[in-house]
């Protein structure tokens, strides 16, 4: 396993980050424990979770994923060997059971304390804002959000948010901060406040979707990463499992995410399916696993710090982790780019 420095910090993180979103709903606590045991043994030292998890959300399951991690940490005593990232939920209709205030100093402080309790730790290495509380494009929204902009009641409180996060860092409860599901404008607003007042914490990472089916990060945010030293933590690198190839041919595997939750169709449109078929042909031609090829491609990008992989079975997890040793040939990369030119970003 290779390691990278988490941007602007002294933390070394594995190139693969263990995703946890299904623990507590699709996966039991024992299955989560098994995944953590295996990941740790493979040298993965970076785990990502959120107060919102598991997803799809249910009020009665709020925070259960963090609790599973906390129980494992208590059992194994390996907290100091790990880099733990979690997130505060934004304001949305599906988070009313968590809070309705968005990102406020009081809400942030309370959310951190609750996450610490569930994780059974006294510090969080990377604390992230899960999505913007303003109206903009994220979670698969596309095109110009004219009506959303017109009805947006958001008041710019980014200075206030950074000030509170700075206090939390000073207290030792969190170490570094990141954003998620953000736009170039949003990231630069946080950077602007830090540059205006250096005592405010600087954003270290952005956790956004990035995969062969969604390379929008390259259009605007990659330059922000390059010029401002912000690392990308790609999530959904296999597009809800679509790039595993298991849905090809119209298949609906029992227990698979899109089978269980048909509304999760972001990566399953007709053009995305054609692109997936084309990527699958490349993998077959070169004797590669489609998911391993898809994950290895992301590591070729200099702005990627660590790729978040989630799995509902040990078989999936092992195959994904094994991608860490795969180096793609120039021929494979060229073929991938050719497909991308034909089907650019079919699942934004």
What are these regions (language model features)?
Residues 57-60, 90-103, 135-147:
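Surface-exposed, active-site-proximal loop segments in enzymatic domains
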Residues 25, 132-338:
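Beta/alpha (TIM)-barrel catalytic core signal, keyed to glycine-rich beta->alpha loops juxtaposed to Asp/Glu
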Residues 28-39, 104-118, 158, 162, ...:
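Short, acidic/polar
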Residues 94-128, 209:
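Active-site gating/metal-coordination segments in enzymes
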Residues 1-87, 106-109, 122, 170:
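N-terminal binding-site loop/beta-alpha segment at the start of enzyme catalytic domains
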Residues 15, 46, 123-126, 176, ...:
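Residues at the N-termini of beta-strands
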Residues 20-30, 94-106, 148-156:
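Active-site mouth loops of central-metabolism enzymes
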């Amino acid at each position: 396993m290779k390691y990278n420095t988490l941007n602007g910090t002294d933390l070394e993180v594995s190139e693969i980050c263990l995703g946890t979103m299904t623990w507590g709903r699709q996966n039991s606590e024992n299955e989560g424990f098994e995944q953590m045991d295996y990941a740790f043994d493979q040298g993965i030292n970076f785990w990502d979770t959120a107060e919102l998890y598991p997803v799809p959300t249910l009020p009665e399951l709020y925070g259960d994923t963090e609790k599973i991690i906390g129980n494992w940490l208590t059992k194994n005593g390996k907290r100091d060997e790990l880099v733990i990232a979690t997130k505060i939920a934004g304001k949305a209709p599906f988070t009313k059971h968590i809070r309705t205030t968005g990102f406020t100093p009081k809400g942030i402080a309370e959310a951190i304390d609750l996450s610490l309790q569930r994780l059974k730790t006294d510090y969080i290495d990377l604390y992230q804002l899960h999505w913007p509380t303003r109206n903009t494009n994220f979670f698969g929204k596309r095109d110009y959000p004219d009506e959303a902009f017109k009805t947006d009641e958001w008041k710019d409180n980014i200075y206030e948010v950074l000030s509170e996060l700075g206090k939390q860092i000073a207290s030792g409860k969190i170490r570094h901060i990141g954003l998620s599901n953000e736009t170039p404008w949003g990231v630069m607003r946080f950077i602007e406040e830090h540059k205006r007042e250096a005592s405010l914490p600087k954003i270290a990472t952005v956790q956004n979707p990035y995969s062969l089916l969604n390379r929008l990060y390259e259009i605007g945010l990659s330059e922000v990463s390059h010029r401002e030293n912000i690392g990308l933590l790609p999530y959904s690198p296999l597009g809800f499992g679509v790039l595993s190839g298991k849905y090809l041919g119209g298949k609906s595997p029992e227990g698979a995410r899109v089978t269980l939750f048909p509304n999760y169709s972001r990566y399953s449109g007709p053009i995305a399916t054609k692109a997936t078929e084309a990527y699958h042909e490349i993998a077959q031609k070169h004797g590669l696993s489609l998911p391993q090829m898809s994950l290895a491609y992301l590591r070729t990008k200099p702005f990627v710090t660590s790729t978040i992989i989630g799995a509902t079975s040990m078989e999936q997890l092992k195959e994904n982790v094994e991608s860490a040793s795969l180096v793609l040939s120039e021929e494979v990369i060229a073929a991938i780019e050719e497909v991308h030119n034909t089907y650019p970003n079919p699942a934004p």
